[in-house]
């Protein structure tokens, strides 16, 4: 559970530390706004994707399923600034599938907390393998990191791409190629 009072106190201290007047008209409600925003953007802390991936439907097909271009927003755990982009999830069912919105909810669970893109990619894949008992999973995450855009090297538009493979995707290069082709369609 997020402690909004601590966040408000901390935000006031930060504003004072950078030389701002916390009682100024434009800032007086900022600590409260930040606390409410953090409650939303860090709502994945302590959550598990199991509740979203546990309701499945029987299928008589083991054909590839791809949900692509799932938009995500997260916060870099190193600088607490946003990174955002698209997630592409491909999996090979093992007789059961999940509702497509549940894949997006899985992304939300793992992106709504201080995060690393590499870990986000792995957590999504691992949860789908575990809770769907999939024959294989491939996850591709494309992200733009504000820690590279607005500070440091200042390279707007630079994208980080991470991938991970589980099950049949580790063994079959043509499956990977099919997914990359489908993502680019």
Curated annotation (Swiss-Prot):
Annotated Pfam families: GTP_cyclohydroI
Tell me if Transcription regulation is a UniProt keyword of this record: no
UniProt pathway annotation: Cofactor biosynthesis; 7,8-dihydroneopterin triphosphate biosynthesis; 7,8-dihydroneopterin triphosphate from GTP: step 1/1
Q: Which InterPro entries match?
A: GTP-CH-I_C/QueF, GTP-CH-I_N, GTP_CycHdrlase_I, GTP_CycHdrlase_I_CS, GTP_CycHdrlase_I_dom
What's a Gene Ontology MF term here?
A: GTP binding
Provide GO CC annotations from the record.
cytoplasm
- Which segments does the entry list as coiled coil? none
Q: What is the protein name for this chain?
A: GTP cyclohydrolase 1
